[in-house]
Each structure stands twice: as C-alpha cells, then as structure tokens.
Amino acid sequence: MTDLSIAVTRLPHGADLPLPAYATEHAAGMDLLAAVAEPVILAPGERRLIPTGLAIALPDGYEAQVRPRSGLALKHGITLLNSPGTIDADYRGEVGVILANLGADPFTVERGMRIAQMVIARYARAAWDVVDSLPASARGSGGFGSTGTRG
C-alpha cells in the first residue's frame, strides 16, 4: 500500500470531529462523520444532505468515492443516493452525504455518527475512438440478466 497525502480543511461546524479514518488495517474506505449541529431525524422515504464539516483537495488523477455503510443499510435501511458519489480532484466545497431512509422506521443522525465511507481511487480519462463496428465478444449485446441468475 502507498500512503497518499490529501489536503483537508476542517470547516467551523466540524472542527471538533475526528478526521475520516480507516477502521481496520485492511479497510479500503475511511468513515465519514456527520457534522450536524442537532440530531436530524430521517422519516421513512426521506432524504437529506448531511454535512461532514470537511473540504478536500485531491491530487490530480484521483477521485473520492462516497459509499454507503453496509451496517446502516442492513440494520436500518439507510443508504446513499447517487452512490457512489464522486468527489472530483478540482472540487473544493464541503463533502456532503445524501442519506436516504429506505427503512420502515425513522432514523436519527447524530453528531459524530459514522454515516458513509470514502474510498480514494485513481481514475483514467478516456478518449473516444469512433469505429464502424465493435469487435465481437462472447457476451455480445446481451445485458440486463442475459447471463442468467444461477452459478
């Protein structure tokens, strides 16, 4: 593994919260915390933008992917819309997390709660090569379940 230095600014409403951190030695994602002033109650079916109190500057060639936490999804039906959310290297605003409650019960987001995870990833920029036909493949144009449902 290579450590990558990422510039981060703590915004005033998140200054007292810990920085995102990896929960275990081999974790790919860092946990993002809710920088809410007061608890936020998400009713079933509701979505809200939750602040993190952080702004970042990623190196060229990197993005940050904001992803749901599996425990919140399984136990409470809490997920992220626009998942994974992409934070581009040239974005300098606050990192926000769009939480959605797909569960049957209201869910309370409290200050400092781990609400999402952030994965830092390299990316490639593509250039289109317009051709008259595409090369053949075993799959062809089959999609949307065309490979079956059984292993």
Curated annotation (Swiss-Prot):
Transmembrane segments: none annotated. Its EC number is 3.6.1.23. One of its GO terms (molecular function) is magnesium ion binding. The keyword ATP-binding does not apply. It is an enzyme of class 3 (hydrolase). Pathway: Pyrimidine metabolism; dUMP biosynthesis; dUMP from dCTP (dUTP route): step 2/2. Keywords: Hydrolase, Magnesium, Metal-binding, Nucleotide metabolism. Signal peptide: none annotated. Substrate binds at residues 69-71, 82, 86-88. One of its GO terms (biological process) is dUMP biosynthetic process. It catalyses: dUTP + H2O = dUMP + diphosphate + H(+). Its cofactor is Mg(2+). SUPFAM superfamilies: dUTPase-like. This enzyme is involved in nucleotide metabolism: it produces dUMP, the immediate precursor of thymidine nucleotides and it decreases the intracellular concentration of dUTP so that uracil cannot be incorporated into DNA. PANTHER family: DEOXYURIDINE 5'-TRIPHOSPHATE NUCLEOTIDOHYDROLASE. Belongs to the dUTPase family. This is Deoxyuridine 5'-triphosphate nucleotidohydrolase.
